[in-house]
UniProtKB/Swiss-Prot annotation:
Function: Inhibits all the catalytic activities of DNA gyrase by preventing its interaction with DNA. Acts by binding directly to the C-terminal domain of GyrB, which probably disrupts DNA binding by the gyrase.
Pfam families xref list: YacG
Cofactor: Zn(2+)
Keyword hit for Zinc: yes
HAMAP family: DNA_gyrase_inhibitor_YacG
Known partners and oligomeric status: Interacts with GyrB.
Organism whose genome encodes this protein: Neisseria meningitidis serogroup A / serotype 4A (strain DSM 15465 / Z2491)
Coiled-coil segments on the chain, per record: none
GO molecular function, one term: zinc ion binding
Name recorded for this polypeptide: DNA gyrase inhibitor YacG
Cofactor note as given: Binds 1 zinc ion.
Amino acid sequence: MAESRQTRLQVKCPTCQTAVVWEPENAFRPFCSQRCKLIDLGGWADGKYTVSGQTESLPEISEPDMAYR
């Protein structure tokens, strides 16, 4: 019986551009490592990345309202 060859999906790590196989075993996908994942997270925290759209104002919460949350 011949084995069927499945094409494995490869993507580039968004941080370092290394080829990464997209499989459930890769806990860091789409990143190649925990390090690249944390570098990306730091970029979001520093405001390097943004999501376009309009800013929505939030209702103000008074001190008594906060006691019930």
